[in-house]
Curated annotation (Swiss-Prot):
The lineage of its organism: Bacteria, Pseudomonadati, Spirochaetota, Spirochaetia, Spirochaetales. CDD domains: PASTA_pknB. This is Uncharacterized protein BB_0063. The chain crosses the membrane at residues 11-31. InterPro entries: PASTA_dom. The keyword Transmembrane helix applies.
Amino acid sequence: MLILPKTTIKALLLVIFGSLIVSFAIFFMVLENNEITVVPNLYSLAIEDAVLELQRKELIPHIEFKFSSSALDKGKVIDQGPKPGTVLRHGNKVIIFISKGAIINRVDSFIGKNIDDVIINLKANSFDNSKLLYHIVQPLEVESELPKGIIISQNPSPGSQISSLTDLQFLISKGKDHLDKHVKNYVGIYYKDAIASLLSDSINFDIDLANIGDFGNIISQSIPPGTKINESDKILITIAKPKVDNKIVFGILTYKLRQHPSYVDISVRLKGVDGKNSLIYSFKSKGGLIKLPYEVNKGSMIELYIYDKLINQTVIN
């Protein structure tokens, strides 16, 4: 039987004991390393992807937003802290900075301008520039000595930084209407003159037709002459259908205008079969349903304009 020297036995015991110590050290290091992770590179990732990547690494995302130099960065990570490659324990916080896009403009000042002029100009500019910076929120009206429709204040305020489509709301003047409106006597008047008077006085009206004599004249009105009315009141007038030959068409142009906070210029124009243009009606309106009688040649075209912008065409057959 082989008997090892004592020195050899001691050496073997030391090797075995040392191996056990190293094994335990490696075991505990592995256990400890399971609680740490390396911060990933999040640059250029979309916000959703960056958050998921941090959650996968058992790190807590903290999101902050700021402007960047490029509009293409919007919604993506443009900076992070700590930097990629940093070793952290699970549950630590990583700040990711998300781009709000580039500052592409500052809010203009519209204070002191008429609301309808501003809206028309903004829409025209958006078509020319192929981009829309503002979404106009319904304006708020307040009592003021300023003329009706004048912008008193705006939100966002002039000079505010914007990077994308921005809600823009105005506070506008209601103005003061010092003239009371009274209904006139329209019965017995030819319909064209009655309509012109109603439009000139900015009185809302509806039209009914009757197949009786007195061709083309107003035969009744729903509100008696001399009655004081409000802006919201509407009068119904009944027209005796005019007598026309087979080349002429009598009808009612009906169209629902978009509501405006103040009066806008409306015109109804006729494009005749001979190519000549003429004006049928010109008036101011805040919008809503309009009914306008016409008497034109077959084949003519009636055009409806807000200011000088064509909004409707009707071919008469």
